[in-house]
């Protein structure tokens, strides 16, 4: 089975980004709620006090009133250098920007700096007594409360004093001037300031502030419950002291022995952490698909209910009647708003209300009385029915026994037990009958009286055999069972689809609980491979319902929870889900969008990553192949935790053979540090890693480590390398990466998008290194602000990469497509005179750029054999080019699927015609642009891009001209043998017209003096073009300097026939001449190097050459016509098919085989006759002019063609003698169209009496081809 991965590279796991990110501005961190921001600022202040206070206690008090980012940067760098000399400057520069510090880190960092508190931290892991853990529990809970709520300052101070006293009690040195003492006093002062503000706020604006801070206080119960458990306290320590632990652990992770102390409270016991998940329950009741075959009957409530006529007394005195709640009608809502403004119509003391209340009480008493009477009547009827049933059963048995007449005394004595046995048997039979009985379904029978019974049986049998229900029916029933209508966004995705479903997205961003319940009922029973909940606002109950619905799925492959809010309890549910689910292999828990009111505890980097790591290592089912952590700031978690996470991911049980993929793309800031990046490259080299998504991370300062790892380590398994929006500053840095990436053997995808600062300077390096990639299949160059001229250069580069199957060049700058800015626009503006309109110049340039790029893009799609995907802004090119590109991609797909696929001749001819029309359309713009150039345009002459593109265009033009000539000659050979169908004859006419147009354009190019000025010397161009692979397809040229010359050893020896002919060509001095056509090519050395005599000689030889070629053509025509007039057909002979008409009119000067055919057709092989020598020179020319009364050879040729003047009048008996030696069996119907009456008689198939129209059309095409072939012979 052929999968999609065999044709293209899947990139659905890569992060595309929200929008184009500006590389200059990178926010340090996302904004938070006011409560969290205030706590962050206070925590930063606290950190300054702990890091900068070594000498005295007055400095932190003086600095506590001001919170400045500049102070943070200035005070923290020297402190880090004092603490550890191994800390680099780059690490310290990034710490204040990448890692926000909270108050929880403040206390822990102070404890780390203080040796007394370091021993207190050791008590967390070593001691299991209640005393030590109580101190830690109090200290951490109060630090968190100080950061978030800051409402218990005295509790914090007492906890800190308790910690200090415990350290002194253990025999440690008293904290006389230690930073911990300063920290204790500082935390009291900070909390005291907040207490003062809260006192004044309670008098004035406490109620207003409490409502705004309510959202920040909601996470408190989650934090407190997590700290009550013994292990969870250690787990919470992972989330809070991230920056300080990173500062100490990251420089010492090599051999430093003291790194184990701060890492001890961060990494809890893996067995205990996973054991805690046993209390998490994921049980859920689901529907059975095979039990509800029909839609359950129900009464769905209307969306616009009507107001009733009955009004109870309570509704009379209420503001909004309860019967009106939920009515969504506009009119009724308007009435209700008006009634709310006026208030209730009645009061409790009103007469109407009292009367209605008394009537209601009376009605209730009457209802109770009737209800009691009905109850008694029902009981009486039930009692009578029961007695009647027993009596009837007994009477029936007695009558049966009396009728038989076999009652004896023995049976009468034992009759009571027999009666009981009979009753049991009857009861059993009744139970069996009742078990078989059921409700008649369907309730509503739709009878069709005009159907045949056999048809109904067939349909019923077919429905029983194929009882598979579509997914939209199942989803509708699930919603009906919840008494809601189906959600349209979900119903459209499952409409008329059967199981299994490939992907299902929940597209409601703010769902209700009933929506989640109905959706989860569906995904529980329907097999779905990929389920997406991206950007859905879920609470804790909804998240639990979703996880419980998917935990037992055996088909689920991928679960996407991007930007879904997950708290600590939800994280445990997710870990339990990963531990129990047996089919999941792709998980997306990215957090790329962070709301401003999101609490700090709900950030992904504050989750329990140690628990997640342990679950990955202990998961024994299908391994995880793809983990996407995009947007998660791993720079804020400890380095050891990050390394352990990646290692457990790469060392799973049942590791996949295809490899693993990891997503670490940044969203708002850069997520990885330099140490993490080095570990990632070592990790990719050590394990079977397909790729790591590093997009949207700032890698501008990490090029040297990346290049060093790529050059030193082997990456045989690496298949993806993503540099999208990585802020690489210079093209040289990107060129270094391309140099070493080109050596990777299995790299199939390269992403160079959003690197506009490196373009177009990187294009020469791309030209050098991209063809060296051994297996590159897909490349992305999106959003690089490339102009059409630069895109054309990219296409010419990518055409050399034959293994490419997909190219993306979307989202380029639209303004540059018209070349309104850049280097081209000033050239035209400065060089324009008063007579030249600048607007028209810009239009010409824009159209030229569009036409040139369209042809280049089409050539790229046509000449790339494996290209099946080309992403581009197709609105910028014409619809005809779009359709042609799509056709080329479809052909490449067929060629990829079927190795024996070949284009037929009609398709190849059609492609050649389209290429010719496209090149000629571009040639007009090229000529106009060349005419606008002047000698002062030095910028254009020095523009290497323009020279390169123009040279490629000229090469493409000559290749096309040669292909057209070769195709015409091949088709004439088929026409000579009678194998050319009618449709190919039509294409042959078009190709002849195209060839004539191409020759005219080449003639115009050859006389344009500005062309050589732009291209430079032809010798330089020849050195580059000789090495190209297309040289074998080009025609042979006389001069080596042309750059298109084929070596002489490759030319066949049949060219001797060509050189033996007279009047074959007239060589122009100083020009590059085609041996076959005799026409000068574009490149010429000098335009005025010949003298007047030489020009006169060239003119004379050119006229004689033209007349000699015409005479040669007429000689091949007249003997055949003469033979047809003299020799009639025999009785047994049949006339030759008209498709062979004019077969000798094909150009005898294109290939050697045609030359041999033309030569053998002139003479009879039995009686060869040498033609008399034709006079030449000025004598012949003057004699012809004088005798015939003409001014030029063109007039003489016109007299022969138009005025029916035969060659016998010019050459006498020589032509008639040659006619007698010619054999009559060779194409007697080939003639000039208007020579004489005999030529018309040579087309016997064309007659007005023949009703077949195809024969007439064929004859018409033959005449037209004869004319065109004659003109082509004269022109050549």
Curated annotation (Swiss-Prot):
InterPro entries, alphabetized: LRR_dom_sf
Positions of post-translational Phosphoserine modification: 68, 103, 143, 260, 269
Compositionally biased residues, Polar residues: 63-72, 178-192, 1124-1143, 1154-1164
Protein name per the record: GLC7-interacting protein 3
Any one of the GO BP annotations: chromosome segregation
Keyword Cytoplasm: yes
GO CC field: cytoplasm; endoplasmic reticulum; mitochondrion
Family as reported in the entry's similarity comment: Belongs to the GIP3/HER1 family.
Location within or outside the cell: Cytoplasm; Endoplasmic reticulum
Alphabetical UniProt keywords: Cytoplasm, Endoplasmic reticulum, Phosphoprotein
Lineage: Eukaryota, Fungi, Dikarya, Ascomycota, Saccharomycotina
MF GO annotations: protein phosphatase 1 binding; protein phosphatase regulator activity
Stretches that traverse the bilayer: none
Further details from the record: Present with 656 molecules/cell in log phase SD medium.
Biased composition (Basic and acidic residues): 398-417, 1018-1036
Coiled-coil zones: none
Modified residues (Phosphothreonine): 99, 264
């Amino acid at each position: 089975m052929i999968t999609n991965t065999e044709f293209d590279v899947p990139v659905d796991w890569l992060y595309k980004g929200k929008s184009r990110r500006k590389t200059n501005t990178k926010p340090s961190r996302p904004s938070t709620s006011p409560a969290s921001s205030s706590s962050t600022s206070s925590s930063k202040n606290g950190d300054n006090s702990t890091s900068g206070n070594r000498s005295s206690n007055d400095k932190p008090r003086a600095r506590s009133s001001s919170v400045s980012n500049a102070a943070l940067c200035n005070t923290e760098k020297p402190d880090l250098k004092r603490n550890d000399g191994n800390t680099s400057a780059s690490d310290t520069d990034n710490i204040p920007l990448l890692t926000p510090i909270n108050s929880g880190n403040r206390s822990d960092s102070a404890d780390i700096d203080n040796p007394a508190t370091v021993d207190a931290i050791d008590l967390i892991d070593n001691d299991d007594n209640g005393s030590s853990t109580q101190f830690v529990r109090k200290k951490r809970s109060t630090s968190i409360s100080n950061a978030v709520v800051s409402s218990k300052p005295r509790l914090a101070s007492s906890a800190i004093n308790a910690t200090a006293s415990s350290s002194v009690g253990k025999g440690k040195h008293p904290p006389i001037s230690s930073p911990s003492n300063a920290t204790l006093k500082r935390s009291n002062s900070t909390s005291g300031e907040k207490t003062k503000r809260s006192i004044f706020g309670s008098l004035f604006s406490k109620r207003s502030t409490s409502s705004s801070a309510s959202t920040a206080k909601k996470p408190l119960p989650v934090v407190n419950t997590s700290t009550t458990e013994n292990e969870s306290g250690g787990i919470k320590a992972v989330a809070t002291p991230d920056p300080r632990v990173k500062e100490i652990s990251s420089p010492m992770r090599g051999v430093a022995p003291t790194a184990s102390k701060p890492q001890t409270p961060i990494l809890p016991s893996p067995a205990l952490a996973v054991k805690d998940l046993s209390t998490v329950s994921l049980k859920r009741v689901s529907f059975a698909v095979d039990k509800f075959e029909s839609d359950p009957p129900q009464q769905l409530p209307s969306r616009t209910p009507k107001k009733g006529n009955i009004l109870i007394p309570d509704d009379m005195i209420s503001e909004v009647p309860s019967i009106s709640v939920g009515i969504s009608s506009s009119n009724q809502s308007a009435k209700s708003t008006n009634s709310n403004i006026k208030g209730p119509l009645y009061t409790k003391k009103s007469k109407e209300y009292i009367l209605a209340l008394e009537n209601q009480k009376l009605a209730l008493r009457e209802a109770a009385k009737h209800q009691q009477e009905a109850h008694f009547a029902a009981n009486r009827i039930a009692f009578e029915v029961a007695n009647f049933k027993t009596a009837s059963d007994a009477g029936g048995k007695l009558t049966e026994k009396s009728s038989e007449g076999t009652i004896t005394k023995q049976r009468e004595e034992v009759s009571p037990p027999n009666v009981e046995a009979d009753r049991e048997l009857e009861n059993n039979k009744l139970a069996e009958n009742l078990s078989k009985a059921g409700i008649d379904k369907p309730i509503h029978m739709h009878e069709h009286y005009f159907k045949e019974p056999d048809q109904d049986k067939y349909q019923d049998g077919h429905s029983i055999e194929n009882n598979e229900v579509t997914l939209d029916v199942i989803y509708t029933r699930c919603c009906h069972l919840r008494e809601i209508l189906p959600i349209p966004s979900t119903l459209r995705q499952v409409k008329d689809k059967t199981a299994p479903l490939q992907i299902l997205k929940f597209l409601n961003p703010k769902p209700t609980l009933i929506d989640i319940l109905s959706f989860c009922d569906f995904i529980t029973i329907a097999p779905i491979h990929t389920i997406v909940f991206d950007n859905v606002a879920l609470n804790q109950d909804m998240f639990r319902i979703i996880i419980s619905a998917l935990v037992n799925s055996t088909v689920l492959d991928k679960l996407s929870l991007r930007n879904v809010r997950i708290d600590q309890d939800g994280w445990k549910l997710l870990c339990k889900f990963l531990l129990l689910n047996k089919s999941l292999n792709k998980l997306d828990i990215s957090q790329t969008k962070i709301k401003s009111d999101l609490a700090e505890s709900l950030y992904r980097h504050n989750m329990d990553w140690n628990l997640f790591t342990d679950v990955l290592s202990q998961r024994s089912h299908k391994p995880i192949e793809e983990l996407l952590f995009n947007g998660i700031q791993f720079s804020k978690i400890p380095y050891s935790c990050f390394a352990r996470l990646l290692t457990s991911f790469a060392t799973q049980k049942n590791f996949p053979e295809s490899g693993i993929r990891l997503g670490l793309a940044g969203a708002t800031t850069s997520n990885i540090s330099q140490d993490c990046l080095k570990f990632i490259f070592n990790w990719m080299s050590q394990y079977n890693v397909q790729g790591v998504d590093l997009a949207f991370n700032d890698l501008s300062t990490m090029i040297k480590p990346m290049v060093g790892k790529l050059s030193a380590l082997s990456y045989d398994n690496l298949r993806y390398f993503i540099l999208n929006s990585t802020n690489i500053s210079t093209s040289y840095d990107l060129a270094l990466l391309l140099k070493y990436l080109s050596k990777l053997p299995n790299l199939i995808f390269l992403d160079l998008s959003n690197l506009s600062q490196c373009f177009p300077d990187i294009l020469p390096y791309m030209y050098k290194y991209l063809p060296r990639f051994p297996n590159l299949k897909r490349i992305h160059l999106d959003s690089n602000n490339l102009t059409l001229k630069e895109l054309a250069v990219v296409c010419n580069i990518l055409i050399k990469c034959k293994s490419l199957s997909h190219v993306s060049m979307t989202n380029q700058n639209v303004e540059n497509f018209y070349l309104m800015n850049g280097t081209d626009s000033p050239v035209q503006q400065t060089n324009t005179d008063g007579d030249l309109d600048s607007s028209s110049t810009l239009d010409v340039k824009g159209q030229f750029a569009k036409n040139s790029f369209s042809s280049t893009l089409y050539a790229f799609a046509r000449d790339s054999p494996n290209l099946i995907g080309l992403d581009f802004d197709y609105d910028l090119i014409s619809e005809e080019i779009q359709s042609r590109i799509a056709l080329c991609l479809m052909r490449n797909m067929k060629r990829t699927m079927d190795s024996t696929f070949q284009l037929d001749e009609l398709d190849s001819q059609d492609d050649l015609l389209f290429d010719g029309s496209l090149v000629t359309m571009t040639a007009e713009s090229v000529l106009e642009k060349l005419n606008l150039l002047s000698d002062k345009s030095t910028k254009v002459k020095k523009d290497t891009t323009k020279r390169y593109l123009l040279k490629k265009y000229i090469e493409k033009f000559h290749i096309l001209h040669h292909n057209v000539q070769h195709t015409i000659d091949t088709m004439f050979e088929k026409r000579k043998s009678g194998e050319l169908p009618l449709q190919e004859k039509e294409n042959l006419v078009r190709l002849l017209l195209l060839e004539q147009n191409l020759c005219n354009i080449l003639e115009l190019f050859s006389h344009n003096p500005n062309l050589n000025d732009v291209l430079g010397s032809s010798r330089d161009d020849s050195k580059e073009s000789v090495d190209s692979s297309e040289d074998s397809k080009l025609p042979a040229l006389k001069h080596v300097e042309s750059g298109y010359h084929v070596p002489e050893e490759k030319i066949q020896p049949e060219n001797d026939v060509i050189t033996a002919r007279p009047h074959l060509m007239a060589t122009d001095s100083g020009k590059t001449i085609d041996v076959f056509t005799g026409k000068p090519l574009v490149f010429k050395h000098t335009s005025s190097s010949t003298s007047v005599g030489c020009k006169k000689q060239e003119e004379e030889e050119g006229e004689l050459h033209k007349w000699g070629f015409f005479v040669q053509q007429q000689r091949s025509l007249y003997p055949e016509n003469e033979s047809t007039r003299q020799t009639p057909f025999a009785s047994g002979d049949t006339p030759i098919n008209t498709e062979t008409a004019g077969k000798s009119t094909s150009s005898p000067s294109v290939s050697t085989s045609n030359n041999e055919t033309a030569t053998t057709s002139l003479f009879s092989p039995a009686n060869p006759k040498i033609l008399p020598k034709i006079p030449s020179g000025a004598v012949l020319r003057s004699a012809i002019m004088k005798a015939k009364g003409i001014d030029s050879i063109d007039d003489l040729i016109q007299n022969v063609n138009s005025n029916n003047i035969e060659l016998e009048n010019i050459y006498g008996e020589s032509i008639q003698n040659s006619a007698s030696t010619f054999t009559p069996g060779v194409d007697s119907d080939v003639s000039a169209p208007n020579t004489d009456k005999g030529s018309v008689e040579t087309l016997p198939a064309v007659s007005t009496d023949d009703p077949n129209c195809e024969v007439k059309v064929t004859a018409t095409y033959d005449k037209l081809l004869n004319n065109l072939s004659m003109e082509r012979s004269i022109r050549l």
